[in-house]
């Protein structure tokens, strides 16, 4: 994933708030305003609108997650997944800042892993910044292990670069 992580802006009571029931559907071009609003708020180095548009054009799996009840069309999160024959590469996993720490990221990741497994993928790979402690905790708790490092992969403040950890999890029917 290409953006510099920020620790989630979690309010003190966020983790005790109930996780909304999520519904998922494919991302469409008319979601991009809402997606970019979230993306630019949670990443110092966000994907551009063009990155998302290109992902849709390329036929990557792109999903948006919203509350099943109440909040209407308001997006809570989104993800982009690229298939590489029998594995998937998680390119973007993002939750709206105000909703961090409520179990939404984990629920989205679990759904993505199940969906990929059902459709024939037997592994999921991703890149993450070593400084992104929330994301690393999420992935480790979900069964991912670090399998490599890509040196100076991400942009960082003041023209610096940050490594990426490559993490992988075999998918199964659990
Ligand atoms: C990373 C992200 C997707 C996690 O989503 P979330 O909905 O906030 O996370 P969840 O509430 O589902 O928590 C899942 C696990 O992540 C970890 N986690 C979440 N927030 C954390 C924090 N602030 N500090 C440390 N660990 C944290 C915990 O292990 C948690 O599981 P547990 O509480 O059951 O042990 C979300 O914070 C986000 O969108 N961040 C900005 C974008 C980003 O960095 N995306 C990932 C790029 S690789």
Regions found by a protein language model. Give the residues of each.
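Flexible coil/turn residues that form the inter-helical turn or adjacent wing/linker of helix-turn-helix
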Residues: 45, 122, 160
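Short, contiguous pre-domain boundary segments
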Residues: 15-21
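Conserved catalytic-core motifs of GNAT/GCN5-like acyltransferases
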Residues: 2-3, 125-127, 140, 145-165
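Acetyl-CoA-dependent GNAT
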Residues: 2-8, 17, 26-100, 106-119, ...
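Conserved glycine-rich acetyl-CoA-binding loop
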Residues: 96-110, 117-119, 123, 129-137, ...
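Short acidic/glycine-enriched loop/turn segments that link adjacent beta-strands
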Residues: 59, 86, 132, 154-161
